[in-house]
A protein has these predicted regions:
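Short, flexible active-site loop motifs that bind/organize anionic cofactors or intermediates
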Residues: 21, 62, 111
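Conserved protein-kinase N-lobe ATP-binding Lys motif
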Residues: 44, 57-62, 92-97
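Active-site core of bacterial EAL-family cyclic-dinucleotide phosphodiesterase domains
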Residues: 2-57
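Catalytic core of bacterial c-di-GMP phosphodiesterases, primarily the EAL and HD-GYP domains
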Residues: 65-123
């Protein structure tokens, strides 16, 4: 079965044309920023697809882990510059552990490499 926009999806993955943005998570009692939610965005240079489209296509072509791995890796690298002790919230597809290419411990290893303490990461 041909998946609509699959070619565009693969080009985005190949170019790694995804970047993170960070949404502040604010403590309503104090007004302090408690952490940041990592959200992925597409470099819209050559595509009309949205990030939500990518996750739908990834599911259809069996590449959810490949996409999620790219998003996590980019977020962790960028989070190296976050304020000390600020939490980093990562969104995770609950079914990802079922993916045969899923790598257990990936987030811990990439966080350590990026200098982000694992105790600051919330999934």
């Amino acid at each position: 079965m041909k998946v609509k926009n699959a070619d565009e999806f693969y080009k985005i993955l190949e170019r790694k044309a995804i970047y993170p943005v960070f949404q502040p998570i604010v403590n309503l009692q104090t007004g302090d920023v408690a952490g940041y939610e990592a959200l992925s965005r597409i470099d819209r240079h050559d595509t009309t697809l949205m990030i939500s489209d990518l996750f739908v296509i990834a599911e259809q072509v069996g590449c959810v882990w490949k996409l999620e791995k790219l998003c996590r890796n980019k977020a962790l690298k960028a989070a190296a510059n976050k304020p000390e002790h600020a939490k980093l919230f990562l969104n995770v597809d609950g079914n990802i552990i079922q993916d045969k290419s899923f790598i257990q411990g990936f987030t811990n290893r990439k966080a350590a490499k990026a200098g982000v303490p694992s105790c600051d990461i919330c999934i």
